[in-house]
Amino acid sequence: MADEILRLEHIQKELELSRDVRQTIIPNLSLRITAGEFVSITGPSGSGKSTLLYIMGGLDKPSSGRVFLDGEDITETEEKEMTRIRNRKIGFIYQFHFLLPEFNAVENVSMPMLIGGRLSRKETRERAMALLDMVELQDKYTNKPSQLSGGQQQRVAIARALANEPKVLLGDEPTGNLDSRSADKVYQLFERLNRELGQTVIVVTHDEEFANRAGRRIHLVDGKIESDRVLRDGVPVLSQ
């Protein structure tokens, strides 16, 4: 049996709107993700999808409950240490690519490795180029973001997210700003990363086609899991 990579226990998230008013985003949610899973998270706007993703990745903290990443309780981890954990274990991809405009593709992909400091500059550059090759941008090494299409920019962002060989790849609406052709290239890339490399992928999306190409689909309503299903070719095969 594959190892558990992520566990959430009785997560609650509240926002303080004023001194006397609090809004509950996630009332009480528990969830386990196994290493190597491809999970899509869907739900209407305001259902808590992105909040849940940020809690999973240590970008936000729950009001109560526990979060375990790769067997480690990260719930109360100090921000400095959490930054180190994110750099080593989590790759983030957002709706907007957030590439540094003054740097070319190789330099953008290199950035997390330079921050991590585990590779030499030569090794860092070689790995950055290999990752760009993997996302089919081998002819764009020296291009800056302004010289790339939206789909190409997002593929550079995916390569950057993979730079430090993360345990978990998290995507928040990664195809939200892309046309259908570019979105399909991103779909295929996520599928290949998961199937060929065993990469754990968790993606928040409004895109039904993307959601159904995952191996597991979790649907949220009002911060609660309404359904959690294993999929095969987009069809539920087992209720969990």
From Swiss-Prot:
How does the entry describe its membrane topology? Peripheral membrane protein
Main localization, broad class: membrane
What cellular component terms from Gene Ontology apply here? plasma membrane
Residues passing through the membrane, by range: none
Q: Which subcellular locations apply to this protein?
A: Cell inner membrane
UniProt-listed InterPro entries: AAA+_ATPase (IPR003593), ABC_transporter-like_ATP-bd (IPR003439), ABC_transporter-like_CS (IPR017871), ABC_transpr_LolD-like (IPR015854), MacB-like_ATP-bd (IPR017911), P-loop_NTPase (IPR027417)
Domain ABC transporter spans what residues?
A: 6-239
* EC number(s) reported in the record: 7.6.2.-
The cross-references to PROSITE patterns, in alphabetical order and at most eight, read:
ABC_TRANSPORTER_1, ABC_TRANSPORTER_2, LOLD
Q: What class of enzyme is it?
A: translocase
Q: Which UniProt keywords apply?
A: ATP-binding, Cell inner membrane, Cell membrane, Membrane, Nucleotide-binding, Translocase, Transport
Provide the binding site for ATP.
43-50
Q: Name one GO molecular function term.
A: transmembrane transporter activity
The record's PANTHER family line, in alphabetical order, gives:
ABC TRANSPORTER ABCH.1 (PTHR24220:SF86), IMPORT ATP-BINDING PROTEIN (PTHR24220)
* Role: Part of the ABC transporter complex LolCDE involved in the translocation of mature outer membrane-directed lipoproteins, from the inner membrane to the periplasmic chaperone, LolA. Responsible for the formation of the LolA-lipoprotein complex in an ATP-dependent manner.
Q: Which family does it belong to?
A: Belongs to the ABC transporter superfamily. Lipoprotein translocase (TC 3.A.1.125) family.
Q: How does it assemble?
A: The complex is composed of two ATP-binding proteins (LolD) and two transmembrane proteins (LolC and LolE).
Entry protein name: Lipoprotein-releasing system ATP-binding protein LolD 2
Q: Which organism is it from?
A: Chlorobium luteolum (strain DSM 273 / BCRC 81028 / 2530) (Pelodictyon luteolum)
